[in-house]
Amino acid sequence: MDLTVIALTFAAIFVVELPDKTFLATLVLSTKYRPLFVWLGVGAAFAIQTLIAVAVGGVATLLPTSLIQVIAALLFLGGAVLLFIEGRRHHGTASEEDGSEFAEKAKDVRGFRQVLASFMVLFAAEWGDLSQLLSVSLVARYHEPVAVFIGAWAALLTVSGLAVLLGRTLLKFIKLHVLHYVGALVCLALGILTLVEVFA
């Protein structure tokens, strides 16, 4: 298991997810439910989603190496475009407005059922998310599924933990569109590096 891949995956997923709807969804849920229950629920959802992404990436490694690298590069570059578009969309808008849809989906439940409710909301929100595509690309690129899983899940747990504990405070000091642009640059760099390896 490569610690460098774990660190790289953590950094990439963290930067991409911090301005994502995942952060906002967790923030909104933590205002309705007990924060610990929210974190447990979303953490379980992230574990399953990341496992699925890593499995898909593992299957992709069975393809010819050059084809895998091209696909990974396209996913990275596609992610950069999507993040740039999101950054433009969020420029000058109130970030918390995007969380209203999650507030509507959150059912009025008590006790441990809040864990299940948080799981269901985040599992649906995260399906096909950019972090999943990025995880697939990283597994295909580095052939380190366990390292990618650890790095990605740790990043998602960290982002959701920040949302639960410091969400509103962070949104006052950090502009979402700036984070989107940073994430776009990370994906662009990974895409270019992968293409360089293909044609080197």
Give, region by region, the residue ranges found by the protein language model:
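Membrane helix-loop-helix hairpins that form the core translocation module of multi-pass transporters
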Residues: 3, 34-103, 166-173, 182-185
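Short, structured loop/turn "capping" segments at alpha-beta junctions
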Residues: 88-92, 113, 117, 130-132, ...
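Juxtamembrane transmembrane-helix termini in multi-pass membrane transport proteins
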Residues: 1-67, 134-154
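Alpha-helical transmembrane segments and their lipid-water interface positions
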Residues: 23-24, 49-57, 121, 132-133, ...
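Selected transmembrane alpha-helices and immediately adjacent juxtamembrane segments
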Residues: 99-132, 138
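Juxtamembrane boundary at the C-terminal end of a transmembrane helix
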Residues: 192-200
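Hydrophobic/aromatic residues within the transmembrane alpha-helices of Major Facilitator Superfamily
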Residues: 14, 18, 47-48, 81, ...
